[in-house]
Amino acid sequence: MSTDKKNRTVSHLMIWNELKWAPSEKQLAQFIHLQELLKEWNKKINLTRLVDGDDFWTAQVCDSLLPLYEELQHPEVSHKYIDIGSGCGFPGIAIAIAMPNSDITLLDSSSKKTTFLKEVSKEIGLDSRIKVVTERAEEAGRNPIFRSNFDYAIARAVASANVVAEYLVPFLNSTGQALIFKGSWSEAEQQILKKALAELNAEIQRTHEFILPNNRGIRNIIRISSINKCPHQYPRSIGKPKKQPLGY
């Protein structure tokens, strides 16, 4: 075995140990194919710089799946996920690979990115479980096809948590959870989020801090659940959640 391959194997083992989950041969092949396609498409459109080595495996794959460590212990369970601002496909495509019985909706406002997401989903054999939508979160959250229709609504690195909450909560069914992926997380941010969630008829279920392997830093996951049906006026019109954020 070459030194590079040995290093990759060690790196992968660290990640799988951290997740307490390991991919099947088919799933590993899908991740590798996804990495290859990202590199290829990056030459056409600017998707992400995190495509090589640990950049891909730790900062993309592990960072996408670690917040779902509980769900990964039962990957056979069927859930409906929506990934808001999916961009280059993380965390949505990673979740689709890891959770073979779940359906994933990838939402992004950029038609270039959704073209990529459609092509990649087809190339790695996931198009039967992945739906790609070109639309703003504020519009999709009012669409009866999507509103109140998901077990999990997820966003990674989109905006501040109180803004993201207004995007996510309208998508949740009565037992659904919104998951906000963050780097650092402060008590001040938590208080603002609590106030925002009160207006959305939702609450923080819990927060959890993770340390990514390979010295990739700290991540926080905020899990949110609905208390009651999200008021019909949310999400507000395009741009308003960012310009006039809830929680102040």
From Swiss-Prot:
Gene Ontology molecular function: rRNA (guanine-N7-)-methyltransferase activity
Residues involved in S-adenosyl-L-methionine binding: 85, 90, 108-110, 137-138, 156
Family designation: Belongs to the methyltransferase superfamily. RNA methyltransferase RsmG family.
UniProt-listed PANTHER family: S-ADENOSYL-L-METHIONINE-DEPENDENT METHYLTRANSFERASES SUPERFAMILY PROTEIN (PTHR31760:SF0)
Main location: cytoplasm
Subcellular location: Cytoplasm
Keyword presence, Methyltransferase: yes
Class of this enzyme: transferase
Protein name: Ribosomal RNA small subunit methyltransferase G
EC number: 2.1.1.-
Function recorded in the entry: Specifically methylates the N7 position of a guanine in 16S rRNA.
GO cellular component: cytosol
Keyword Transferase: yes
Highest taxon in the source lineage: Bacteria
UniProt KW keywords: Cytoplasm, Methyltransferase, rRNA processing, S-adenosyl-L-methionine, Transferase
